């Protein structure tokens, strides 16, 4: 939910007022140029002034997941973002990626259902992550079904190639598993 509060930001020369959205965009800009500590500081300022600003929680989740590798804190921020702004599509795939990585079955199922019902979410990525989750669980049939669904949804050429490779990998694992299945006949 976008707020319209203002935050005081001091510079050496003058006091300048920024809206929370402007401060958020500054933080995202800092992060995109590799200035992680400055971006983190700005995001924490936003959260301290407006703890309900969902998109700052999303960016913090990404920082803690991909940069800091603090998965519990990342999960907290992704979950908070999802609760505060459930229609924000960008959050779902990153949160789901974390849950698949941590093998959290119940949350994977719950978040994937919400993601697939949220407009703007990359459904191919959601199905691909579900395929990966089931592949890690060695449930080849469910993995294949989800990778095939991902294939039907994908629009990016490189993502399509990745999904095709995942499907081939699962089929190979299925054949390999069948090769080691023994039948006892009497």
Identify the function of each model-found stretch.
Residues 10-20, 144-186:
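Terminal, low-structured helical/coil segments at or just beyond the last alpha-helical repeat
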Residues 56, 91, 126, 159-163:
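TPR alpha-solenoid repeat register
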Residues 18-49:
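Alpha-helical segment of the N-proximal tetratricopeptide repeat
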Residues 32-41, 68-80, 102-114, 139-146, ...:
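Structural signature of tandem alpha-helical TPR/SEL1-like repeats
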Residues 59, 94, 129, 163-166:
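Canonical tetratricopeptide repeat
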Residues 51, 86, 120-121, 155:
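Short coil turns that delineate tetratricopeptide repeat
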Residues 45-48, 79-83, 113-118, 152:
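Conserved structural position within tetratricopeptide repeats
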Residues 28, 62-63, 97, 132, ...:
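Residue-level recognition of tetratricopeptide repeat
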